[in-house]
């Protein structure tokens, strides 16, 4: 016999947190965590309905950031520090979207890993 499905209880979080933005050439992923590193909300371009080459556009990045930020804002988060990783095209749009939802951005850090002459990069594209 089927039981009634329970709605997941929304837990209030601390008003401070961290936004991790990973912007690759193919996708963008936004994860919002509390001060201890526990995930509060997350979103990606694919989760928001973008497919293929549309996933790495600034607009997809904006929509993705808004979706994650709204969920975190509803749970009580107000101040965030932003960590950006990757060379993607929608890095600036993602930060503007966070501010548009109502989260106050306190600091922005670029933590893109840079090789000290490590692996050989892929060959140049010829279109």
Swiss-Prot record:
Signal peptide (residue range): none
Protein name (database record): Small ribosomal subunit protein uS11
Keywords attached to this entry: Ribonucleoprotein, Ribosomal protein, RNA-binding, rRNA-binding
Subunit (UniProt): Part of the 30S ribosomal subunit. Interacts with proteins S7 and S18. Binds to IF-3.
Gene3D superfamilies listed in its UniProt record: Ribosomal protein S11
Family, as annotated: Belongs to the universal ribosomal protein uS11 family.
Pfam families documented for this protein: Ribosomal_S11 (PF00411)
GO BP of this protein: translation
Biological role: Located on the platform of the 30S subunit, it bridges several disparate RNA helices of the 16S rRNA. Forms part of the Shine-Dalgarno cleft in the 70S ribosome.
